[in-house]
């Protein structure tokens, strides 16, 4: 029963689109119809600046972390806990409150990973920061950190988390597919930090 309750909470929390919420609160254009059209922190950086992007990043990561922490509190463990994290990411990608049009899941993945294992989460965040600092492409940082997440999970000895973390990584790569096509064509926008 605790697992089912955790799954429901994770999906409902994951469905909170902080890009849309922050845009409304700050009286900014809807990120789903402006910039890249993505309801995420990188597009909010373009649409509303650093402060708006920071709030979105914080909110999207926090909901993933909180979903996992609630499940931990309810004594959900091992692969079941990692599946709760996966459902939080699915909520972000396909939010029930926003007609199933969500973001790409990177910040939520980071929050989930911090909740599963502080060190795995920290290394994934560090990987993203290093890659975006070098290449200035959020999509490249997303790809590298998504690929790194299952690798770090194995290195940390948390093979019980591996299958759900692998699914999260595949979903994030899939959601960035258009970005990778733009990278190939040389039309992908760089991030201005």
UniProtKB/Swiss-Prot annotation:
<comment type="pathway">
    <text>Lipid metabolism; phospholipid metabolism.</text>
</comment>
<keyword id="KW-0812">Transmembrane</keyword>
<keyword id="KW-0444">Lipid biosynthesis</keyword>
<dbReference type="GO" id="GO:0005886">
    <property type="term" value="C:plasma membrane"/>
</dbReference>
<dbReference type="GO" id="GO:0008654">
    <property type="term" value="P:phospholipid biosynthetic process"/>
</dbReference>
<dbReference type="InterPro" id="IPR003811">
    <property type="entry name" value="G3P_acylTferase_PlsY"/>
</dbReference>
<keyword id="KW-1208">Phospholipid metabolism</keyword>
<dbReference type="Pfam" id="PF02660">
    <property type="entry name" value="G3P_acyltransf"/>
</dbReference>
<dbReference type="GO" id="GO:0043772">
    <property type="term" value="F:acyl-phosphate glycerol-3-phosphate acyltransferase activity"/>
</dbReference>
<keyword id="KW-0443">Lipid metabolism</keyword>
<feature type="transmembrane region" description="Helical">
    <location>
        <begin position="2"/>
        <end position="22"/>
    </location>
</feature>
<feature type="transmembrane region" description="Helical">
    <location>
        <begin position="154"/>
        <end position="174"/>
    </location>
</feature>
<comment type="function">
    <text>Catalyzes the transfer of an acyl group from acyl-phosphate (acyl-PO(4)) to glycerol-3-phosphate (G3P) to form lysophosphatidic acid (LPA). This enzyme utilizes acyl-phosphate as fatty acyl donor, but not acyl-CoA or acyl-ACP.</text>
</comment>
<feature type="transmembrane region" description="Helical">
    <location>
        <begin position="51"/>
        <end position="71"/>
    </location>
</feature>
<keyword id="KW-0594">Phospholipid biosynthesis</keyword>
<keyword id="KW-0472">Membrane</keyword>
<comment type="subunit">
    <text>Probably interacts with PlsX.</text>
</comment>
<feature type="transmembrane region" description="Helical">
    <location>
        <begin position="112"/>
        <end position="132"/>
    </location>
</feature>
<keyword id="KW-1003">Cell membrane</keyword>
<keyword id="KW-0997">Cell inner membrane</keyword>
<protein>
    <recommendedName>
        <fullName>Glycerol-3-phosphate acyltransferase</fullName>
        <ecNumber>2.3.1.275</ecNumber>
    </recommendedName>
</protein>
<feature type="transmembrane region" description="Helical">
    <location>
        <begin position="78"/>
        <end position="98"/>
    </location>
</feature>
<comment type="similarity">
    <text>Belongs to the PlsY family.</text>
</comment>
<keyword id="KW-1133">Transmembrane helix</keyword>
<keyword id="KW-0808">Transferase</keyword>
